[in-house]
Amino acid sequence: MLWAHKNRDKNRYLEGAYRGIGMPFGEFKTIFIKGLPLMLNELFWAAGMTTVTQCYSVRGLSVIAGLNIATTITNLFNIVFIQLGACISIVVGQYLGAGELEKAKDADNKMIVFSVFCCSVMAAVMLLVGGLFPQIYNTTDEIKSLATSFIAVSAIIMPFCAFTHSSYFTLRSGGKTLVTFLFDSVFTWVIVVPVAFVLAKYTALGIVAVYFLVQATELIKVVIGYFMVKSDVWLVQMV
């Protein structure tokens, strides 16, 4: 920040940055319309994940404890596809902004493949060492066993999550914020939450099987994401 302010000639965007917070109404309206679906998406997605966890909780406190351990470890590995998704948004967004649509499409395809490949490697590592992490917790053997199983399920699903996450950021880079809202949070409430509720409350399936089937709904998003990205609906000239 200090460097940017000391080198105003190289950072012309800082000129007049502190003169006021006024914004033309038309520009504000555009930002609000584009940004609102993203804000609502994060809100409803978080609420959906909380509801799914509540569905699991009807199977006992041991399940929640196991999930907490598994989620903590899984989130460390999930950083890979989360950050690669953000990279897709930046790189593809730059190409779209420059009007280089073919380069944007080529870069997007390569980065999606790279993301899935990296997460496949990370998933293999999770499967190999996932059982070690629960052992560092001072808890019961039942909870450790559940956590190990949940980690294994997350590892199996991770490459699919990488693809859907990449698809999400591809659509977002093209300004399709309403589509991403439908693709993410609406899908969570229409598909994931009902599946978790029915399986956890009205079936005799073990919690690991329930968790696997709920996580496997990601495959539906893979199909949807594939056709949406392939349709090039996101491939638009931004300026």
Kindly label every feature range from the protein language model.
Residues 62-63, 177-178, 206-207:
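Membrane-helix interface segments
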Residues 38, 42, 50, 54, ...:
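Transmembrane alpha-helix boundary and packing residues in multipass membrane permease domains
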Residues 1-36, 92-157, 199-239:
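Short alpha-helical transmembrane segments in multi-pass integral membrane proteins
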Residues 43, 47, 119-127, 162, ...:
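Hydrophobic positions within alpha-helical transmembrane segments of bacterial inner-membrane proteins
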Residues 1-2, 82-85, 154-173, 179-191, ...:
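Short runs within selected transmembrane alpha-helices of multi-pass transporters and secretion channels
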Residues 66-130, 161-180:
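Small-residue-rich hydrophobic transmembrane alpha-helices
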Residues 43-76, 94-95, 132-141, 201-202:
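Helix-terminus/linker motif at the lipid-water interface of multi-pass membrane proteins
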Residues 2-3, 20-51, 76, 80, ...:
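Hydrophobic faces of transmembrane alpha-helices in multi-pass small-molecule transporters and flippases
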